[in-house]
Amino acid sequence: MSKTLSFKTYSAKPGDVERKWYVVDAEGQILGRMAAEIAKVLRGKHKPEFTPHIDTGDFIVVTNAEKVALSGKKLDAKAYFSHSQYPGGVKFNHVKDLLRKKPEKVIEHAVWGMLPHNNLGRQLFKKLKVYPGATHPHESQSPIEMKVN
């Protein structure tokens, strides 16, 4: 006899989610590929109990942000645009300058672009911790090393 299948959709509840901590070494990693993997884990899409409207994701700690790689000629050509909403208030921040001054902002900008731009996305983004060097203050959470292809 065959087993009867259940066609019920599982919906995770906020209290039922178990969160893990992962650490990613950004040294030599391509920025966009790494950001896509990080966004997937922050969102919780790597878990079978993923629910689109609930935060089911894990925490991510990124180290060595200053050693991230960009493919092609993006290091020279890529710039981030911002505007102050005043006439003539256009600003361009080039990636090369940002990597020198605030390397964590480059990774944060790439990951934010891959998360939903709403309240849930802002909540997910708070679980991303980026540090320019090899050390981080989250050793007490005993993060698991995550390999990014």
From Swiss-Prot:
One of its GO terms (cellular component) is cytosolic large ribosomal subunit. The keyword Ribonucleoprotein applies. One of its GO terms (biological process) is negative regulation of translation. It holds the Pfam family Ribosomal_L13. The keyword rRNA processing does not apply. Gene3D superfamilies: Ribosomal protein L13. CDD domains: Ribosomal_L13. GO terms for molecular function: mRNA binding; structural constituent of ribosome. Keywords: Ribonucleoprotein, Ribosomal protein. Belongs to the universal ribosomal protein uL13 family. This protein is one of the early assembly proteins of the 50S ribosomal subunit, although it is not seen to bind rRNA by itself. It is important during the early stages of 50S assembly. Part of the 50S ribosomal subunit. HAMAP family: Ribosomal_uL13. This is Large ribosomal subunit protein uL13.
